[in-house]
């Protein structure tokens, strides 16, 4: 375990840790939270992350924050798949190695980062959580974000043996305990999974997806418009049949959305359970109930939600950061 920062404090404020949870594209909410902290002058001393939370924390400490955000903002769901690379033969649909080489030149050993940092992953052989606090920062993020079925498991050297590691969300989606082990005296956690609705289109019983057929005449302009309109009846029938076929296929959960929803449900339940065991001083739970974990092109919305969630708990955050009186304690007294 990376030794806690033993450098003398420059003030009487407590050493503040940030536990950034898993959530794939919903990780943009972390960016909104960090933007709020920066605006208020809140200094984070310790970063502990799971999956996308680990990547966000590493990007801050590797000094690639702005280029990382610019790159990530350019991604759509399709772009993300292309960036990572498809590989069906090695234990996952996506091979993430290609994406992680993008910032390889900026990678550093975790021991050389300016502040304590660690990522949490899950040992595929034992099911235990593993704290990655040494070696390549990007390799730690790669292991921490290896979502089962989606991203290939990561082979990682732990001590003197190699282990196959998968997403930390399978064991500890919001690593509050890791932040404290790294030396944090106060911890702010950001949980992206507790308030999620995995498949919102199935949230009412006895309903199926309804896909309205588009207007068959829409976009029929130019010299071929009269001919197209003459065959309007046949075209309407074709459009209607296509819409019905699509609705029928989506009236039941599809393979990958079922896998993603299952992961969301398990991580959400696990995050709630662990929140009672590893208690954060401030727990932020952005309402991402309508957010897909693959909605990379919704970064502005997710970032806004994270920012607004932090704003709603501003006084609590400032208090634990030592920048304002602790209202809860004064009330108790």
Could you say what each language-model-derived stretch is?
Residues 1-50, 58-333:
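Patatin-like phospholipase
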